[in-house]
């Protein structure tokens, strides 16, 4: 049995990325697994409503590159959300049926855009803005 702890961070956004940087800055040497339901690496959300729409080709929103995550020794699971947390077994179950074990679990999932009643009836020109795809849909 390994004495190196595994920290699983659920949520690959700004909070998840910040947690990784803080863990490593504070000399945490254990295993870190970052789990996100989006296919993108961690990125900043504030520019989604501004820069990404106005200057999509020039806007850099990525917080941690694939290389930086590798340098930090982080295993990344993308496009695969968590469907269940089993705190007794210390595991999370993913959408694809896989299970991931943890010693410590950090939930950094953020929020979701609230869809008002009858939202879909408003037509294809009404949007929510929560993720990169939402922002890209608004680019002229």
Predicted features along the sequence, with ranges:
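FAD-binding core/adjacent interface of flavoenzyme oxidoreductases
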Residues: 1-8, 62-140
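Beta1-alpha1 glycine-rich phosphate/pyrophosphate-binding loop at the start
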Residues: 2-75
